Amino acid sequence: MQCNDVQATEPDIKVSLTRVGVTNLKKLVKLKRKNKRDIVLLPTFEVFVDLPSSQKGIHMSRSPEVIEEVVENILLEKEIYGVEDLSVEIVMKLFEKHEYATRAEIMLYSDYMMEEKSPVTQKDSQEIGKIIARAYGVKDENGKIAVKKMVGAEVVGITACPCAQNMLKENAVANLKEKGFSSEEIEKILDSVTIATHNQRGIGTVMIEVPNGYAVGISKIIKIIKNSMSGEVYELLKRSDEAFVVEAAHKNPKFVEDCAREMIKRVVDVFDYLPEDTQVLVRQVNKESIHRHDAFAERNSTIRELRDELKTLTN
C-alpha cells in the first residue's frame, strides 16, 4: 500500500519554521578512546531542522532514524573519540535525510561518571557530572554545508555568600567590643573561627567551540568549573570530610558573578591555544537557600574579547 506524502504538501498557513524535530530521545552510545576502554554513555538527544514555508511538515521519523544509523553504523566504521564529533556526524546525516533543510542542529546531554576521593578520609566514591555537545550546520545555495561544534560540561559545587558573611562578621566585631575585647584580641578571634553565611548549590556550565584541527578536553572543562566555586561537593563524606568541605567553602566566599568571572579567566588561561574567534559560553546558576529564587550569571563571547578585557584589567 502506497501512502501519500502528507508532509510534502503545502501547509494552510505558509510560514517557515526555524526548528522542528524531536527532543528527549535517549540512546546508548559507545565512544572509542585511544589505548583505553570505550566510554559508555546514555545521552539525551535533541535534533532539529528548519522547515520551508512551502512544506507542511518534516519527515519526523527520519530524525530518530539518523541517530540510530550514526550510533549503530558510523561509530563502528569510524574512529570517533568525542561527543562533539558524534554531533557533527549526526548533523551531516540530518541534511541527507531532510533534503529540504538549510539548517540542522543537535544538542546532546549525558551524565558522566567520575571517580573521586573525599578530601580528608580519601574514601572512594562516584560523582556525576554532565557533558554537553552541540553541532549546528548551515547549507548555502550551492549545497555547501558549514558545521560548527561545541563541547562542554555542567558541574555542581557549593558557594558561600560574601555579603551575609560580612554582615555577620561586623555583628561579631560589635558584640566582642561590647564585651570588652580589644581590637587586637578581636582580630585573633576572627582569624581563629569560621564566620557563618548562607550557602547555595552552584551549577556551573562551560561550553567551548571546537574549531577544526583543535581539541578541547572535557576533563579540563570539568576541572575549571569545580575550581571556580567556593568548594566542591562529594557524594560520600565522613565527619572530618564534611567539616573540611564546609570550612573551605566559607573561607572562599563567592557571588554568582564571581564564579562566572573565575570560569572565564580559567578558560582563557587553559585554552590559550584556541583561535581568537573561538566561541565561549559560561553560565553559573546558584540555587538559593534563603530565597525562593535562583541567582544567575552568564557570558557569551569569543576568546579574543575575553582575553582583551582581562588584559585591560591587568594593565
UniProtKB/Swiss-Prot annotation:
Pathway recorded for this protein: Cofactor biosynthesis; 5,6,7,8-tetrahydromethanopterin biosynthesis
Cofactor note as given: Binds 1 Fe(2+) ion per subunit.
Keywords in alphabetical order: Hydrolase, Iron, Metal-binding
Cofactor(s) essential for the protein: Fe(2+)
GO molecular function, one term: iron ion binding
Residues the record marks as site: May be catalytically important: 161
GO biological process: tetrahydromethanopterin biosynthetic process
Record keyword Nucleus present: no
Tagged with keyword Repeat: no
EC number: 3.5.4.39
Pfam families in alphabetical order: GCHY-1 (PF02649)
Gene3D superfamilies: Urate Oxidase (3.10.270.10)
Catalytic activity: GTP + H2O = 7,8-dihydroneopterin 2',3'-cyclic phosphate + formate + diphosphate + H(+)
InterPro entries: GTP_cyclohydrolase_FolE2/MptA, GTP_cyclohydrolase_MptA
Family named by the database record: Belongs to the GTP cyclohydrolase IV family.
Complex and partners: Homodimer.
Function according to Swiss-Prot or TrEMBL: Converts GTP to 7,8-dihydro-D-neopterin 2',3'-cyclic phosphate, the first intermediate in the biosynthesis of coenzyme methanopterin.
Designated name of the protein: GTP cyclohydrolase MptA
Gene that this sequence comes from: mptA
